[in-house]
Amino acid sequence: MKLKSVFRSVLKYRKTNLSLLLLITYSIITLLYIFDHERYKLNLPKEDEHPEFNDLLETAWGDLQIITASFHPYTSKENDKVHDYLLKRVLEITGNSSFASVSDDKESERSILFQQQDPFNESSRFSRVTYFESSNILVKLEGKNPEEEGLLLSAHFDSVPTGYGATDDGMGVVSLLANLKYHIKHRPNRTLIFNFNNNEEFGLLGASTYFNHSWSNLTKYVINLEGTGAGGKAVLFRTSDTSTAKIYQQSVKENPFGNSIYQQGFYSRYVRSETDYKIYEENGMRGWDVAFYKPRNLYHTIKDSIQYTSKASLWHMLHTSLQLSAYVASNSLDTADQMPACYFDFIGLKFFVISAKTLFYWNCIFLLVSPVVAIGLYLISRDRMTWKSHSWLSWTRFPLSLAAGIIVQKLFSNDIIRSNPLTFSRNYFWPISAFFTQVIFTSYVLINCSNFFFPCADMKSLSIIELFIILWTILLFTSKLLYSSDYRYTGLYPLSIFFLLSTIAAILRLLALALGMRTRKRLGRECRDHHSNYSSHSQIDMERDGQENLEQPQDQFTSSQDDQASIQDDNVSTTSAGPSHNVDEDHGMDSSSQQHDERVPLLKGSNSMEEGLSTRENSLKLEYTDYAWIIQFLLIVPIPSFILFNSVDVIMDALNHTVQEGSKATFDVLRFGMVGSILMALPILPFFYKVNYITISLTALLFLISASKTLLVHPFTNSNPLKVRFSQNIDLSQGNAASVHVLGREGNFLKPMLQDLPSIKYSSTHINCTSVTNGMELCMYDGMQPNLLSTNGNTNISSMAKVHVLHNNRNSTERSPYEPIVAELLLDVKENRACTLTFESRHQAKSPVREITVYQKKNSAPQKTNITKTIKSASGINELQLHKLDFDQETYHIGVQWFPKLLTDGNLEDDKLGTKDELSVSISCYWGEYDSESVVNGTAVRKIPAFDELINYAPLSFSFTNEQKGLVIVKDAIIL
């Protein structure tokens, strides 16, 4: 009996049990979170257990060390060294394989001229034409069944000028080498193409060039390996559809990691990055974008190096891609379901997939069926007189307390914006914790205050039913979003899971009421009618929250008394119904005077209830013990809390550093934090009003700590630095001054840092800082001259880039006024790989340029003759981007054709000055090497000393990246 008594005591709905269960729940969630984030580090292959995998990892790590020895952007000579190393490794791996072929774009001098929308800004209406000379390395492994649609594996080997490219994208490249080595030993069934591509960073150009290769016709599927962060785990960033998501599910059995929340966030442009996957997808391929995604404040900086990553991260990407490629290469694929997919993993152990369209259909079923069932059960309970009527004060306290919590949260967010808007960049846990504790603490205070003055003995059940109504409304809204987005809002699935579990809990309560015994209820009402002169507390409903009327034989009566007595001390109410009595939710009775026997009158001082009971009822013990609350708790709290916490963590982990990219991103992150914390609070709100004083005290303490950390702690540290963008601009039309541009977030961060630089501090150099769009600040000052070239004389920066007009017939008398104007330019640019020409007419709203010609010098052509590539555009061309491989080729030869104003608007007007058809051409050329030296007059000097100074003297709470495709930009302008 004692064991039974203890068991019943543990299951009682009381403060201690509830608080303990909450503690256990959140402890388990914390342990699962830690397990999820640390487990992959312990799964490295061991030489004695998996010798082949261990060899692949060790070889890949060695390759990564060599590739990331220096910065290697497309605009650098080191880029060629990486290309040559990869080509050597590819030839070593393929050897004399009978089914392997290698193609080197650099050797074949492959180039493309094509019109391209800005891949990093889909809203841009700027018409761009790009000329690109490729050095992609492609490998073809012909499959045993070459008629099957092939698989492309792709990664880019260029880095940005300011990063070593360990994760972006060195790990992807060496993972491709490992995959190549594996599939050489295990010949695939379908044909595999490996694309080690170049110049992803400045236009996704290597991927674009792939479709100029004949092998592109062999592939239908793609695995793209990328790095948009700087380590951690490689996530399934996005995938084409439900079929490809299920292929990932079937193939990646060990450490799967993916979430369609990332996919929705990426397509919604909350992340200002793009990968080669975009190009492959636009060209009709289906597949998987696997990428590192955090931390973004180290992404594209000097800390994207092998020192800041690990073998565990490399193995996670390598093993994921290997599992996926091996499955696709060797199995028939079911690719019928091409609807967008909702998917997620459970702590790296299990991967779940559902079609977004199927989820929408289930949402519709839930939305239709759940209110019908709920209303039906309500009507049954009303008809059977088991429904307990409640005042409007009881019904409104839960939603009003939630609304009050949201208002308090909004007020606190205003304080964050005023005092520390970038706090999310350092640690998003503290603001999320502050928002979360505000909501639950406010709800606790308001509900218990209202219960003090207007007691409600069924608060939990009312709250669960109202939570069901709130979630029904939310699900209706999100389902509409899912439908209107053509099922691309794939990150909304957590709300469907939450709604389903909460609905089950609410319906269980309604079902208990509908099936409950009526006799007790009727007699209780009769007694209340006979004793209406008693105090107001006697009108309280005698059933406690969630109680069931259970008939038990008389021989259990004594044990029931013992059970009740054993827990008497804990059966007090969460609130008092006045100074003289307490309402006990567990019993629905005045606990100060109750006896643990059903024969005691339900109304204080009255024996009429006992007199009114029938002989049968007198022989039965009706036990008012609520054990159903545990089922409700387990349905509503643990699983939804874990899923919602994980979803919020996924969002914040990917976006928290984007607050450095502008005020819009800051408000987005703040909004996600607020909404996410509300969703995290919803599962526990129906229960939280009943926690004990220790729990609520800890909640208040956690809020105070979180609020102080959020508002008072500096947002940037050595490990979480502020990322600043650098460029040095030399405008030859304005002189030779080398103006340094430093771009970063507003907030008095940049100028104090710059004022402490030696070249500024000791020369009184003026720093001009101005606010630019989107909450960013641009600081400019005259910096030290760059040394881009080795020379034996004085460096003349104006000799770095010159423009020669070879031909221009604008003012030719032989040209008809209706005839397009033609000009030829020769750009003389030394040791350069990238330039941009921008076209503008002062007299025409749109660019009048309709045709661009690029004259190439082909080394393989007879006597290195020129070969032309021409592109036309009826809508006009605003910009021409030029990318060439040969540093020794010092010229770009360009032809431009544009329409006179007469052709574009048909207005024949006098042009006495002869300027209406003028075309302004702005030229910008880029140099991206800084971690190297030039020899000037026999002395070794650093190429970009202004950038070196920032790296050497700025506090460690700053990190630096390039503002444009080069660190030094030489500009000029002419009028044609």
From Swiss-Prot:
It is a multi-pass membrane protein. It is found in: Vacuole membrane. Keywords: Glycoprotein, Hydrolase, Membrane, Metal-binding, Metalloprotease, Protease, Transmembrane, Transmembrane helix, Vacuole, Zinc. Residues 559-570 have a biased composition (Low complexity). Binds 2 Zn(2+) ions per subunit. Its cofactor is Zn(2+). Its main location: membrane. Residues 37-359, 413-428, 483-496, 649-668, 714-976 are vacuolar. Gene3D superfamilies: Zn peptidases. Zn(2+) 1 binds at residues 156, 168, 226. Zn(2+) 2 binds at residues 168, 201, 300. Residues 528-610 are annotated as: Disordered. This is Vacuolar membrane protease.
